Amino acid sequence: PLSHQEIQSLEHNHCQAQDWQLITVAENFSPDSIYNVCFIGNCQIGSTSDTVTTDLGIELPSGIRNARIINSSIGDNCLIENICGYIYNADIEDNCVICNVFTIQTTEGTTFGQGNTIFRLPPPVGCGVAFLGDQYEESDSTTDRRRQAKEAIKRMVMEEVTRTIPKRTRIETGARILSTDEITNSWIGAGTEIR
């Protein structure tokens, strides 16, 4: 948890928390790089000892400025500033730049697209295969076994999906999100840039 001195420094920098005991920080955390931030719920903050390089090649100090962070983790050496709404239920990895964004959030019950049924398209015209009647006949027992097998596979897939669905938005290492209104229920890959 934060030390008493770190809490005082954060409050001096116009930061507040619903409960300072729910905020954890990395070893190289510096409260001087956090300004005008409201923390709600369990939040983890990484090291803020380094700089980040913008797409224009400008070196800026890492840190969090002008933001509301709710139940989220922020990795080492990120620059997060001017979040007009909030960052809610997100895991932000190291060296990310997130500036001038309204909201990043994860909503209740999201599946991140996992477990959705996708129907295949019919084959293009002229690509079909002609079957003769006796080649394609199936007995009722074969059809029933196939149906049962499909249902068993679907049930196994849905059990695995339910077990492994992420509960939070994830922003991987080095991603940049700039001047964007809303990111909801997303998994943003390493090095991705969103404008």
Task: Identify the function of each model-found stretch.
Residues 1-195:
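Domain-scale signature associated with acetyltransferase and cell-envelope carbohydrate enzymes
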